[in-house]
């Protein structure tokens, strides 16, 4: 059995990480959705120090951005009341390819599925599951293929630095096809990560439907329930 913890502000100093190692944590995930790997070298240094202190070793996994879609910056939290109308692009900043993909009746999931909208017309949507939305949260368009590359520029930069920092596992989010994993695996090999484990994260229906095609191309499958 493996046990993972996420590196974060409350879990990033040597003492806390050493305590987690002693309690049986076998791996640490570093979420790169909001920040580059280079900005978290202090956390990684603390983890390696904790490993030396305890004599225990943990897997260090980076969770990439991948083809994930996120909303833009918002000056203030936006309350979304169930039944209310909200406009993507005007009220909620989104990229142009998102606006172009909208179709009436389409479901839009926000913040890993915590909130949901139904497209009425153009960018106008009806809130079907309310909450309070803040900037840079995830956005999923059910049934849409935005054809974004498997790895974004930030992912490529992070993978280029990963081996030198002791990373030995890579998580690819929003896996859609075998092609996605082939791209990620080849990029890992090119950056000295040939022996690192590849975790494939299923976060949408297309990825789930294609699972038989890509299952053999990864080492571990992770199910992200929020957007499913």
Identify the role of each PLM range:
Residues 1-228:
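Non-catalytic helical/linker scaffolds that mediate oligomerization, partner binding
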């Amino acid at each position: 059995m493996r046990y993972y913890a996420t590196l974060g502000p409350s879990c990033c100093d040597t003492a806390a990480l050493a305590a987690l190692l002693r309690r049986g944590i076998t791996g640490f995930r570093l979420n790169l959705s909001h920040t580059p790997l280079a900005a978290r070298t202090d956390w990684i240094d603390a983890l390696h120090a904790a490993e030396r202190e305890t004599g225990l070793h943990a897997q260090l996994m980076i969770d990439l951005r991948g083809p994930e879609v996120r909303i833009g910056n918002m000056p203030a939290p936006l309350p979304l009341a169930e039944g209310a109308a909200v406009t993507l692009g005007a009220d909620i900043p989104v990229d142009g390819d998102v606006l172009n993909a909208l179709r009436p009746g389409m479901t839009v999931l926000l913040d890993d599925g915590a909130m949901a909208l139904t497209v009425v017309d153009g960018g106008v949507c009806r809130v079907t599951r309310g909450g309070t939305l803040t900037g840079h949260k995830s956005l999923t368009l059910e049934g849409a293929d935005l054809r974004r590359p498997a790895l974004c520029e930030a992912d490529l930069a992070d993978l280029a630095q990963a081996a030198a920092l002791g990373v030995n596992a890579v998580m690819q989010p929003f896996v859609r096809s075998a092609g996605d994993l082939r791209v990620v695996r080849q990029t890992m090999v090119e950056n000295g990560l040939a022996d690192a484990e590849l975790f494939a994260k299923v976060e949408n229906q297309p990825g789930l439907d294609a699972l038989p095609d890509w299952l053999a191309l990864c080492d571990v499958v992770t199910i992200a329930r929020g957007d499913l």
